Every structure is written in C-alpha cells, then in structure tokens.
C-alpha cells in the first residue's frame, strides 16, 4: 500500500492541479469576455487537447515499454525506447504545428465555430498552436519521469506550470485586458515552465537520451501501439465535448453550449483525477507484469479501483452541492447558471461507471493488452455519437444530456466483460 500511495498520490495531485489548470482560462475569460468567450474556448479546446493527448500517448507508450523491458532484464533495449519516444515527440510537435496552421479555417468550421464565437476561437487557437511544442513535451516527458520513480518531481513541475498560468492569466486577461490572446499566451507559457522543469529532471537524473536507436521504426510502431490507448483516454473527453457542442447547439442553442462548458469544466477535474489514479498505478502494474507477478498486478489494480471510486463519490457530492454555483464562478448569465445546475445531476450519475472503465483501461495498456484497451477507450465516443443521433430526437435537450451518461454506463459494461475475459485467459 505504501508503495502504491507513493506513486498514486503525487499523480492524483498533479492531475487535480492540471484539471484546475484546464479551467483557469475559462474562469478569467468568462469573467472578462462573458458567455461568448467561454463558449469560444469550449468549442476550440478539442484541438488543444489533441496536442496534449499526442504527448501523453507517446510518453506513456515509451514509458510502459521502458519499464517492462527493464523488469525483463533488457536494460539497453528499454533505454532505446526512451530515446525513440523523445525523438517522436519532437517530430509530432513539428507535424501538428504545420498541419494546424495550414488547415486552421476548415478545422474551425468542423468544430462548429460560427458567428461571434469564430473570431474569438481563432484568436485563442492560433496562439495555442504556436505553443504546440511546449504542450507536447510537457505532457510527453512526465510519464517517463513517473516511471523512473520521479512521481513527486513530476507533480512539482506541473504545479510550477499551473502557478505560472494563474499569475499570467491574471496579468494578461484582467490587468492588461488582452482577452482571448492573453489567456492563450498564459497557457502556453505555463506549459513551457513544465517542459523546462521536465528537461531539468532528464538532465539531472541522466535519463538515457543520447545514443543510437536500433530498429527505430519498429520501436516507433510499438510505442504507438501502446500509446493509442492513453492518447484516446486523454482525447476522448474532448471528442465527447465536440459531439456534445454540436448537438447542444442544434437542440438548445448557444445557451446550452455555454451551460455544457460550465459542466465540462467541473467534470474535467473529476476525469483527470481518474487519470491520475490510472497513470499513477501504471508504473507498478507494468513493473509487476514484466516480472511475471500476476497476483501483484491484480492487487495494484484493485487498490486503484477502490481509490478511484472513493474520489468519484467525493466529487459527486461536491459537484452536486455546488451545481448552481458553477455558472456564477465562470461569469455566466442567470439562464446559463440555472440550466447548468439543473443538468449537473444527470452527468454525476455516470461518474462511478467512468471510474471503473478508466482504471480497467489503464490496467490493459500497462500490461500490453492493446486490443482490449482500444475497445474500452474508443467505445465511449462511438456509443455517445450513436445515442446522440437517437435519444435527443425523443427527449430534445434532455436527451443530449442523458446520452453522455448512457454511453458511460455501456462502456463500463464492455470493460467489465473484457476484464472477465482477461481473467479466464490468465487462468
């Protein structure tokens, strides 16, 4: 238990802070620009999450293979996965920056940025794209640090970036009145602090950065194979956000979009807490898996389930009690605040199911069960889209809200079936 807490507690705290990190721009912009600014960030944020998810996926893929190979006694091969992951992070940063700058207009249209939302969304997104490298590396190196026993240091670097973001948001958005641009610059400079701190750790701890990468292409494929699941876990809430925004706009207008922005900000912290438990327990699961200790893997996973459920229950209680305060925090209108409070209980009903599927998925990719992890990750957005095409036709806007919960319940059912299949296969 002590070793479990040593890995999980710093990870949970770090992701809790990154959850607040994610809503800081919304807080400052919502209270400065108003509902339209809040909606603009909400609409374009899936692209920002795509960048960060790419870093998370590559970093986690490299970290899992590094830990497993070391546990199997193949140290040099494991070290090569670190070098491969870092080079892949750089390549991904360059490609994402170029693609997003070239296709900015069609991407904005695809995201549904229309009317008064579009110019504000473009202003925010363009600056965030300029900082792609900071975001990809800030999220990509952290899993490597955590798998090297540096969970506490990873937490410190994330706290430093978070603190910088708050200070700069206050300065740029409220004092200098730079609006959307100020919020974007504050975010990427905060990520730059985390990235620099991570490189300091890499240098001080002498992680295997320099040297050759034998079978580079093969290792890239293996990193991607493992990383698709954590990439999807980070991106999935934003895919869901994209779907929800489009259907909220169709059935409830800009008021529903602004309301879901408030709800999504509140739920983001919960989702990231679950990610903190899953990613925090991953190094131990990968280590025991590499050592062939199946019972230890199950023990760590069971502790992760219990921790995630306790956190989910606590968050459900807090969000329920403050459901009519969320809109006020983000400077929303009275209509948006009322709609947010009325809809929040529906979303809270799915959190325990989400916690189960999230930890189950982490266990799958930590033990190289890529197919099962893919199914768990991508089932939720696919099911959500199917439900959004059906349920709102009957229940209108309430059907949009309900579709999210139903998709989480069904995904948890799929995860449970796959978990049972895994147990039978091991036996």
Regions found by a protein language model. Give the residues of each.
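N-terminal transmembrane alpha-helices
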Residues: 1-32, 46-61, 65, 90-97, ...
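Alpha-helical transmembrane segments of multipass membrane proteins
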Residues: 23-27, 98, 140-144, 166-171, ...
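Transmembrane alpha-helix boundary and packing residues in multipass membrane permease domains
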Residues: 11, 15, 27, 31, ...
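Helix-terminus/linker motif at the lipid-water interface of multi-pass membrane proteins
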Residues: 20-39, 108-115, 171-178, 238-269, ...
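Small-residue-rich hydrophobic transmembrane alpha-helices
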Residues: 38-98, 135-154, 259-323, 354-368, ...
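Short alpha-helical transmembrane segments in multi-pass integral membrane proteins
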Residues: 1-11, 66-133, 175-228, 285-350, ...
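Transmembrane helical elements of multi-pass membrane transporters/channels
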Residues: 6-25, 127, 138, 161, ...
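Short runs within selected transmembrane alpha-helices of multi-pass transporters and secretion channels
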Residues: 59, 127-146, 157-165, 183-198, ...
């Amino acid at each position: 238990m002590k070793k479990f807490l040593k890995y999980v507690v710093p990870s949970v705290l770090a992701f809790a802070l990154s959850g607040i990190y994610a809503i800081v721009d919304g807080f400052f912009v919502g209270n400065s620009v108003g509902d339209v600014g809040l909606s603009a960030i909400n609409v374009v944020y899936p692209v920002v999450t795509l960048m960060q998810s790419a870093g998370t996926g590559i970093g986690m893929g490299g970290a899992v293979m590094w830990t497993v190979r070391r546990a199997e006694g193949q140290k040099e091969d494991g070290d090569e996965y670190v070098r491969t992951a870092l080079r892949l992070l750089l390549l991904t940063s360059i490609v994402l920056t170029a693609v997003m700058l070239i296709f900015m207009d069609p991407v904005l249209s695809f995201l549904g940025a229309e009317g008064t939302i579009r110019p504000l969304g473009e202003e925010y997104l363009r600056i965030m794209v300029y900082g792609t490298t900071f975001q990809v590396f800030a999220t990509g190196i952290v899993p490597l640090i955590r798998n090297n026993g540096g969970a506490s240091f990873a937490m410190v670097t994330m706290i430093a970036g978070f603190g910088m973001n708050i200070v700069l948001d206050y300065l740029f958005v409220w004092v200098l009145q730079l609006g959307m641009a100020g919020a974007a610059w504050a975010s990427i400079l905060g990520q730059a602090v985390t990235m620099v701190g991570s490189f300091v750790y890499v240098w001080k701890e002498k992680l295997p950065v320099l040297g050759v990468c034998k079978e580079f292409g093969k290792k890239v494929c293996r990193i991607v194979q493992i990383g698709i699941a954590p990439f999807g876990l980070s991106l999935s809430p934003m895919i869901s956000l994209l779907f929800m925004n489009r259907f909220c706009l169709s059935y409830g207008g800009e008021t529903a979009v602004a309301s879901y922005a408030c709800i999504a900000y509140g739920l983001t912290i919960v989702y990231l807490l679950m990610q903190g438990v899953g990613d925090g327990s991953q190094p131990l699961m990968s280590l025991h898996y590499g050592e062939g200790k199946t019972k230890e893997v199950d023990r760590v996973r069971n502790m992760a389930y219990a921790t995630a459920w306790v956190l989910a229950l606590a968050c459900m209680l807090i969000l329920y009690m403050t459901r009519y305060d969320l809109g006020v925090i983000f400077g929303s209108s009275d209509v948006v605040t009322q709609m947010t409070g009325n809809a929040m209980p529906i979303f809270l009903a799915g959190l325990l199911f989400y916690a189960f599927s999230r930890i189950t998925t982490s266990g799958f990719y930590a033990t190289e069960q890529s197919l099962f992890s893919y199914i768990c990750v991508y089932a939720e957005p696919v099911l959500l889209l199917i439900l959004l095409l059906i349920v709102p036709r009957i229940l209108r806007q309430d059907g949009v809200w309900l579709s999210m919960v139903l998709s989480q319940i069904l995904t948890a059912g799929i995860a449970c079936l796959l978990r049972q299949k895994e147990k039978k296969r091991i036996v």
